[in-house]
From Swiss-Prot:
One of its GO terms (biological process) is proteolysis. Transmembrane segments: none annotated. GO terms for molecular function: DNA binding; serine-type endopeptidase activity. Keywords: Autocatalytic cleavage, DNA damage, DNA repair, DNA replication, DNA-binding, Hydrolase, Repressor, SOS response, Transcription, Transcription regulation. Belongs to the peptidase S24 family. This is LexA repressor.
Length: 199
C-alpha cells in the first residue's frame, strides 16, 4: 500500500474509530463535519484512501466504506542451509516455508530463506540456527551482507569487490576473510532480514 499523508492518516483513523464505535461507516458528511471540511474536501480524502488501497466503498451508498484488511505476513520458501563458516554444499531440497512480516521486504522481488549453520557472522547478530531472509539478486554493493556461491559451496559473508578479486569478510574477529577471483564466485542474494526462533 502507498504511504498516506498526515491528513489522510487522520481521516483513516477517524473512519476506523467510527466503525468500531457505531458498527457502520461514517458518511462523507460525517467526515466533513468532524474535520471542518466541505463535503467535496472530505470526498477528496476518501477517494485518495480508496486509490491507495486502504478502503473500498460503493458510491451509491452513503455509508458503504469498508476497511481493507492489510496483509501482515507472507510465506517464503526455505531453500536449505547456508554456512556462516567455511561454506556448505549447495542447496538441499527442502519442502518448507517460513512466515515473515511484510514490512521485512520492500517492493517487488524474489525472496527466500536459508537456515544458518556456524558462527562467522555473530558480530552482525546472526547466529547458528537463525533463518536469513534474502532477496534474490546477482549484483550487490560493497559492504553488504550476501549469500554467495564459491567452489560449489554457499556461504554468508560481507561482500567486497576489488577489481578482479572478491573479499568475503566474516563478522567474527576470530575468523579470516576469504579472498578469491571474482570470476569464481556468484552472488545469489542480499540479506534483508533475520528470523530467530526461541525454544
Amino acid at each position: 500500500m502507498k504511504k498516506l499523508t498526515e491528513k489522510q492518516q487522520k481521516v483513516l483513523d477517524f473512519i476506523k474509530n467510527y466503525i468500531q464505535q457505531n458498527g457502520y461507516s461514517p458518511s462523507i458528511r460525517d467526515i466533513a463535519k468532524h474535520f471542518k471540511l466541505t463535503p467535496r474536501g472530505a470526498h477528496i480524502h476518501v477517494i485518495a484512501l480508496e486509490k491507495k488501497g486502504y478502503i473500498t466503498r460503493n458510491p451509491k451508498n452513503s455509508r458503504s466504506i469498508s476497511l481493507v484488511k492489510r496483509q501482515e505476513s507472507i510465506l517464503i520458501p526455505v531453500k536449505g542451509k547456508i554456512s556462516a563458516g567455511m561454506g556448505i554444499e549447495m542447496f538441499e531440497i527442502v519442502d518448507e516455508e517460513i512466515e515473515i512480516p511484510v514490512r521485512m521486504i520492500s517492493g517487488f522481488g524474489n525472496y527466500f530463506a536459508l537456515k544458518v549453520e556456524g558462527n562467522s557472522m555473530i558480530d552482525a547478530h546472526i547466529i547458528n540456527g537463525d533463518y536469513v531472509i534474502l532477496k534474490k539478486q546477482y549484483r550487490i554493493p560493497n559492504g553488504q551482507i550476501a549469500a554467495v556461491v564459491f567452489d560449489n559451496k554457499v556461504t554468508l559473508k560481507r561482500f567486497y569487490h576489488k577489481k578482479d578479486k572478491v573479499e568475503l569478510v566474516p563478522e567474527n574477529k576470530d575468523m579470516n576473510p576469504i579472498v578469491c577471483d571474482a570470476k569464481d564466485i556468484k552472488v545469489i542474494g542480499k540479506l534483508v532480514g533475520i528470523i530467530r526462533f526461541y525454544e
